[in-house]
């Protein structure tokens, strides 16, 4: 079964991320389907008409997002109807629901004329209730002629705003597709940090080969790297749920045996959430002294609900003066070794440990670029310090990429050092 997605809106052609496509793709994958093609199209009628004709010819199910609003450039309904040579009509029930929407919110006593357009339904389509906004979805079964044959197709028209699209998709599109599903498909993600992508691929190769040795159609793999975090994505399908679950367990065990502590989490885990969980389990607290990251480590930590139970403070000391005044870094240290040095980063860690009275303290200083680098200290040079009541350490790194990349890699590495400290195994 071929499923195609058409996403409308001129904003998609100017660099805006298509989050609807990512969401729909992941939901379909979870129930054993995949999108054969995703097309972004603007608000020109002739372009959308062309894509409808192509999609109806090659796919069994076509899903659209966007173009159901009240303005002149919302043309999905009328264009789909024209392509299929069908009429549209104002649905009285939809008109009433739009009226109720405005009355409940005290926006207007009657429907604005412009919104009446959203009650236009393609003849023969089923209305899919929108409980969040004013534009209902539509589901239409139709026959599309290709040469001399007619094929039964299904069209779903969904709103563009994600908060409106998602409930309609989950309550209507998913149940419809599940009725055609002949098996079970489950997905998983392992998150890896501390080794290169090429090394990861080489290490897990035997595990993957063993997994697909019986029948490769049951197991699929993918590797994605971003800012030193490597995601190993896998999906397992079959008609027996026990087989699927056992295969996933074997995969996780196999990956764990070769990657060991370089695996930091699964599925929705992040370095910050895992570090936070370990701090809670060990009943420990942490503080940070940040220079080149400018508070981004603290931001990552405090993104996690409940982080106040283990996170004490973060001091952003960007200038030499603030390093001396707030953290007690010695002037001679800065003069003799510079702000970006192992000596300075160790004093920063010790300073914030004393200041916060936390169990662990970490510090970062580096040259994020694009200016400021020298032959001895190039852009990307970063030192991370670690201090507790027993000892102080420093770690040196040379990161590549843009300023944003270097800062993000520094944040991730600091959090991973914290994680490894909490599991008492260092691999740096």
UniProtKB/Swiss-Prot annotation:
It holds the Pfam family CinA. InterPro entries: CinA, CinA-like_C, CinA_C, CinA_KH, Competence-induced_CinA, MoaB/Mog-like_dom_sf, MoaB/Mog_dom. Coiled coil: none annotated. CDD domains: cinA. HAMAP family: CinA_B. Belongs to the CinA family. NCBIfam families: cinA_nterm, PncC_domain, PRK00549.1. This is CinA-like protein. It comes from Endomicrobium trichonymphae.
């Amino acid at each position: 079964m071929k499923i195609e997605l058409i996403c409308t809106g001129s904003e998609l052609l100017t660099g805006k991320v298509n989050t609807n496509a990512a969401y729909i793709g992941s939901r379909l994958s979870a129930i054993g389907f995949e999108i054969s093609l995703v097309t972004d199209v603007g608000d020109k009628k002739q372009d959308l008409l062309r894509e409808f004709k192509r999609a109806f010819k090659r796919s069994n199910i076509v899903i659209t997002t966007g173009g159901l609003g009240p303005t002149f450039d919302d043309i999905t309904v009328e264009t789909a109807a024209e392509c299929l040579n069908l009429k549209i009509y104002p649905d009285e029930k939809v008109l009433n629901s739009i009226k109720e929407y405005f009355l409940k919110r005290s926006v207007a006593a009657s429907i604005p004329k412009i919104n009446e357009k959203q009650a236009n339904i393609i003849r023969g389509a089923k209305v899919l209730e929108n409980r969040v906004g004013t534009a209902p979805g539509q589901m239409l079964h139709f026959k599309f002629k290709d040469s001399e044959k007619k094929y039964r197709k299904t069209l779903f028209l969904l709103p563009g705003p994600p908060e409106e699209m998602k409930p309609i998709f989950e309550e209507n599109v998913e149940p419809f597709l599940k009725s055609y599903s002949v098996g079970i498909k489950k997905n998983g993600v392992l998150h890896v940090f501390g080794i290169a992508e090429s090394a990861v691929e080489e290490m897990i190769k035997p595990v993957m080969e063993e997994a697909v040795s019986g029948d490769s159609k049951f197991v699929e793999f993918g590797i994605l790297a971003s800012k030193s975090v490597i995601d190993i994505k896998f999906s397992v399908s079959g008609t027996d749920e026990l087989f699927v679950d056992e295969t996933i367990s074997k995969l996780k065990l196999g990956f764990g045996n070769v990657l060991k502590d370089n695996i930091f989490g699964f599925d929705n885990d992040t370095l910050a959430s895992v570090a936070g969980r370990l701090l809670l389990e060990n009943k420990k607290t942490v503080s940070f002294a940040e220079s080149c990251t400018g508070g981004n480590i603290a931001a990552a930590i405090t993104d996690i609900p409940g982080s106040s139970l283990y996170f004490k403070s973060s001091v952003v000391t960007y200038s030499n003066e603030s390093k001396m005044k707030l953290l007690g870094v010695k002037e001679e240290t800065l003069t003799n070794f510079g702000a970006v040095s192992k000596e300075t980063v160790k004093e920063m860690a010790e300073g914030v440990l004393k200041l916060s009275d936390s169990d662990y303290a970490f510090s970062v200083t580096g040259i994020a670029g694009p200016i400021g680098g020298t032959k001895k200290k190039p852009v990307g040079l970063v030192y991370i310090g670690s201090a507790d009541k027993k000892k102080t350490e420093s770690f040196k790194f040379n990161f590549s990429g843009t300023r944003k990349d270097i800062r993000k890699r520094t944040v991730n590495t600091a959090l991973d050092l914290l994680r490894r400290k909490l599991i008492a195994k260092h691999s740096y």
